A protein has these predicted regions:
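A short glycine-rich beta-alpha junction/loop motif
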Residues: 282, 436-444, 476-502
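A short beta-sheet element
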Residues: 407-409, 413-462
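Non-catalytic DNA-recognition/assembly elements of restriction-modification systems
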Residues: 319-373, 497-537
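Long recognition/docking surfaces used for binding and targeting
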Residues: 26-101
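Sequence-specific dsDNA recognition surfaces
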Residues: 355-369, 384-413
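Conserved Class I SAM-dependent methyltransferase catalytic core
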Residues: 212-277, 281-283
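Flexible, glycine-/basic-rich loop-and-beta segments that form/coincide
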Residues: 274-353
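Conserved S-adenosyl-L-methionine
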Residues: 97-194, 199-201, 238-239
Length: 537
């Protein structure tokens, strides 16, 4: 890919020359046709005249399965003349040209991590949907020149461009095939690098032969089938593979029974452009390993999203025995780190009574409200109403509904409210108002069902470093917070005597009042001082 600034400016001029009446989606294809025409002209024994070049262009466009990009011959001749003065572009430049937002590309930092799975000597390597790796394909092939690469794509145009890119290289095969279909190839490979489609709602047809119907889940199952003995699959998957139930749980169990997990790496949010889906990099092998390496990556640069510098640093790493991972029932990276956290270990080794939250409380999501009514008799507590210490009742939404439809959602004094999604975890205790209230569907309600639990004490615990870590580990796979209310049932909380809880809760409530009073007095004094000073101006 061209890096020199002077050449980049020339390239932009090159691109501008081909635009004309073509749409942005056509630029890349037009550029490919022109590049191929220029290559053929360079290799021709005799220089072709403009009529011959135009006929050649039509032939190349047909080969690329592209409609005639230059219906007007004169327009083609003008563009061709313009391009003759420019240096040759690579096929990588052709692949990378176009609307960045419309392309999905694997960042170099992720490619670098995947590349660590190469070994010295010959390997059969498969890179499906290779256009996603296009900026780095030539580098990978050149660096690992003694390995044989199979690059696949589902797109006919990309198939042709990749074929041109590696024309004459006997160590590279290009195939047009679909990795989301059974038996997409009969070959097996030593190493497979893949970033499948994820974050879309479309699923394959119900009569699919795979465990799951999601494209990303199909990819990991299907690609793993094509590993040789001691083969390795390095694949990026959305975080839901680590926690989801149903067919996804069945897929996890299948992968652990048939293969070995070698490494699970948590990737930072924003590593891939144009998606908010939380992702992890998995290393799966047909070889044997007793330990699974667990890593958590962060960006080297805090402003990575703005600067585009997405270099990765290992923030934390550990390992877990494969049998222990199987016993966990999921692949929750945060929970693995939590179990090895000093605060967690101290808690587990303490003599304090411990109890699963679901045994002493009912946990449920609020109700979706579609129609607001300023004069409605029922209040709705939204995420925005939940403060760090209390609920802002003055700005509640209201609506009207039949009692029977909301009876199970009416909030009671002492209910603990937690945002189910958003950017921050804030916890507050509800107090009954003069009108009935419910929580919105984005709010989780925890209600004590046993006299052994004080929800004020529970709030204080969840606000503690250990309690906050427990909540974070129940977060599901998106870039923004998304806590599963069902997962909260399994949280193990410290449960001292109710007398001790009440003592802690009473002191908390008393000191909170003192704190709020002091804050209010300080604000009043400050506002008064400002008013006096401004009056003297």
């Amino acid at each position: 890919v061209i890096n020199d600034n002077t050449e980049i400016n020339r390239v932009y001029s090159f691109f501008n020359a081909i635009r004309g009446n073509n749409t942005p989606n056509e630029y890349q294809r037009v550029l490919a046709v022109l590049k191929k025409v220029m290559e053929i002209q360079e290799c021709a024994q005799n220089e072709l005249d403009y009529d011959e070049l135009y006929e050649l262009m039509l032939s190349v466009a047909t080969d690329f399965d592209i409609p005639n990009p230059f219906p007007e011959k004169d327009r083609f001749i003008d563009v061709y003349r313009t391009l003759q003065g420019f240096e040759k572009l690579s096929w990588t430049d052709v692949l990378e040209y176009g609307d960045v937002k419309s392309k999905f590309r694997v960042p170099e930092s992720v490619v670098d991590e995947m590349e660590k799975n190469f070994i010295e000597g010959f390997q059969e390597v498969l890179i499906p949907e290779a256009e996603k790796f296009s900026p780095f394909l030539e580098r990978l092939v050149d660096t690992h020149y003694d390995s044989h690469f199979t690059l696949t794509t589902m797109d006919a145009f990309y198939y042709r461009v990749l074929t041109e890119m590696f024309d004459g290289n006997e160590m590279v095969d290009i195939k047009q095939t679909n990795i989301y279909q059974y038996e997409f190839t009969s070959e097996k490979y030593d190493l497979i690098l893949s970033v499948p489609v994820f974050g879309i709602r479309d699923k394959v047809c119900e009569n699919s032969e795979f465990i799951c119907r999601d494209y990303d889940m199909i990819a990991v199952e299907n690609l793993a089938l094509h590993l040789k003995s001691e083969g390795i699959l390095s694949i990026v998957l959305p975080a839901r593979i680590t926690f989801a139930g149903g067919n996804v749980r069945e897929l996890r169990e299948f992968l652990q029974s048939m293969y070995c997990l070698k490494e699970i790496s948590d990737l930072p949010s924003g590593i891939f452009d144009n998606t908010g889906v939380k992702t992890l990099l998995f290393t799966i092998t047909t070889g044997r390993t007793d330990e699974v390496t667990i890593k958590k990556f962060v960006f080297e640069n805090e402003d990575a999203r703005k600067t585009g510098n997405k270099k990765l640093l290992v923030q934390d790493d550990t390992f877990v025995l494969e049998d222990e991972l199987s016993d966990m029932g999921d692949w929750n990276v945060n929970r693995i780190f939590e179990s090895q956290d000093e605060d967690w270990i101290k808690f587990q080794e303490s003599n304090v009574k411990k109890q699963e939250l679901g045994a002493v409380a009912s946990i449920f999501r609020g109700k979706a409200v579609n129609r607001k009514d300023l004069n409605g008799s029922i209040g709705v507590v939204n995420i925005s109403n939940i403060g760090e210490y209390e609920i802002d009742y003055s700005n509640l939404d209201h609506f009207e509904e039949e009692n029977r439809k909301i009876a199970n959602y009416i909030l009671q004094t002492g209910d603990l409210l937690i945002p189910a999604r958003g950017t921050a975890i804030r916890i507050a205790i509800f107090e009954e108002q003069s009108y009935p209230c419910i929580a919105s569907s984005n709010v989780i309600v925890i209600r004590a069902t046993d006299e052994s639990l004080s929800t004020t004490y529970l709030k204080l615990f969840f606000d503690s470093p250990l309690g906050r870590k427990m909540l974070v580990t129940r977060q599901q796979g998106t870039a923004v917070m998304n806590i599963s209310y069902k997962e909260l049932n399994n949280i193990e909380i410290p449960l001292p005597s109710i007398e001790e809880q009440r003592s802690i809760a009473e002191e908390y409530t008393r000191e909170l009042k003192v704190y709020k009073k002091a804050i209010q007095e300080a604000e009043n004094r400050w506002n008064s001082t400002l008013a006096k000073l401004q009056a003297r101006i």
